[in-house]
Amino acid sequence: VSVNLPEMYFNGEEWYSRMMELIDGADEYILLSTFLGSSSPTLEPLFNLLEQKAKSGVKVYLIIDGTSNLDMTETRFVMTPLGYLRDSGVNLLIYSPMSFTHIVNPSSLIVRDHRKMMIIDGSVAAIGGMNINYISMGAGEKCQRDSMYVFSSVELSNLFIDEFVQIWNEGSIKKMDKDEFKKESTEKGEYKAWLFNRNVFKSQVSLSGMFGSLINDSTSSIFLCPYLPTIDSNMAKSLRNAVERGVDTEIWCSTDSRGYAAKGG
């Protein structure tokens, strides 16, 4: 797809504030997907707003992973499960819940939905690594460090809608029609972007293969900022080749000056 440069957020509180603005501005629908989702005293305004939007006629769909209630971060001390949102008209799907049927089929327990994305009215698309929970957005200076990116793009929103509706329809008896949410796109962004989606059961491609291909095609610069800087032999070879052909290559490995990561948070 073609996109322009996104808004970038590296602070949970700042993203929380921007997320509230985007949700408050929704007129037609809000599609939200997260890995760990739960409320807390600091996040109550967000979930209150989702309830208000649903009551006002805005379609609100929320997908959270089935492990959300087993959150082992600092969130566990203040969390409130989100099942109550259904009473206000919010459409809530718990992806692969921790149930007896999954226990007798253990392979299904390891497949989690780790994506975090949001689509507003088919024109705003957000993606990144922040969960919708206390430790990602509501813990002040103790917030985990991650990032979110907001694109004003109908074209990218349509791709996200495809993914969201597929996940929803696989897990819910209340089906969504993606054509009800998509919009026609005539925009042409300044940059090319790719959405890489890997299904652990169906996909024959790998993340390392994707990164290797991008690195091999680079001509001027590469910047990597991984959370866990582990690469396989093919990626290492691609990076060496890039350096040898004169590509400016930087890898930043994150450290936490607060000592937070070392405490297991």
Regions found by a protein language model. Name each.
Residues 1-265:
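Charged, low-complexity intrinsically disordered terminal segments
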